[in-house]
Amino acid sequence: MRRPVLACSVLLLALLAAAQAALTPELSRELADAQYVYIQSERKTGDFGKPSEIWFFVDGGKLYVGTRPSSWRVKRIKAGRTRARIAVGSPQGPSFEATGALVKDPKIEEKLMRAYAKKYPDGWARHAASFKDGFRTGERVLVMYTPR
């Protein structure tokens, strides 16, 4: 009786590990050095849209962006089209597929703003207030991309 239970437990753990896709070490290095990612969100046809350059930060193996709720990436996520292709550094750079989700997490929003201040010191001074106020008022939303 113990062997079937053990075999089922091992299989379940393997399936859970596969479901928790992670960034490769190479992509993690590329992301650490990149200033921008280029996100292509899923259209109604199932194809990906045009790549859109955006600031980002990575935390816990997930990629986060702060954006306006009127952006195509947000509209498509709200419509249930959560697949995205994310290119690192340039539209032709190394890429991965991810699943997008809207999240409301003040701790992650704070981490994002601290990361942006450090990573984008020249541009952040112009945008800091709109991000901080925007997250509070809903004029900015947090999108989390989980690698597939």
Locate the predicted segments by residue.
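Extracellular/periplasmic catalytic domains that process cell-envelope and extracellular macromolecules
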Residues: 30-31, 48-50, 57, 78-79, ...
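Short beta-strand segments
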Residues: 34-68, 84-86, 95-97
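Short, P/G- and charge-enriched loop/turn segments at secondary-structure junctions
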Residues: 25-27, 42-43, 128-133
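Bacterial N-terminal signal peptides
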Residues: 7-16
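Positively charged n-region of N-terminal signal peptides that target proteins for export
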Residues: 1-4
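Boundary at the C-terminal end of the N-terminal hydrophobic targeting segment
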Residues: 17-21
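Short N-terminal segments immediately surrounding and downstream of signal-peptide cleavage
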Residues: 22-40
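Short, structured beta-strand-loop surface elements
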Residues: 72-142, 146-148
